[in-house]
């Protein structure tokens, strides 16, 4: 009969690496509700000092208050991300708080209209917030992160912007804006490599948000904002360089 193998006890204590997010300064746009609010809350719970940006001042202050009540650190900065001057003011305030470590671009609008009746105003607002706003914030974050040689960026697109996925009528402007976000993220990853800046894009399917309920009340969401926020935190807390430039589709969690 074989003798049992004796267990060797190590006198060296097991050491776990500290969370990357702990004590980092993180900026979340679209932080007044939905994915943005859930992400800001989750980042604060992970130890980050979170700057929350959105147009709705009252809702933004509500999310900020709940984060602080839970013991987190949060700074609200009302901002229209489609306005270049407003984004410049936002990043000036961020710079006053410290070195920016992470950016999550969750600001977005969703307006449904038949293609033949899509007005120029709807087209410009949708691309202005979803694509131009993401560009302006990523450009400013890139400039802030590059001198430090480190930075992590997460953008939010949609399955509607992913090639060969199911598309829905009335979302021409939205779909185009999300295709653009995916391409923008790839470009940031290419140029960010030499500066230690990584960028990934998440493309969730239907998420249970107020925005989606208004646009398509009949659609049954398979994801919650918390589902997306948890993945964002996990990504930011991990080395992003190996997957920088990737677009990660998120399907139903049901």
Regions found by a protein language model. Give the residues of each.
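C-terminal helical subdomain
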Residues: 3-7, 194-197, 201-202, 217-254
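Substrate-binding pocket helix/loop in short-chain dehydrogenase/reductase
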Residues: 114-115, 122-127
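Active-site-adjacent segment of SDR/Rossmann-fold oxidoreductases
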Residues: 166, 187-197
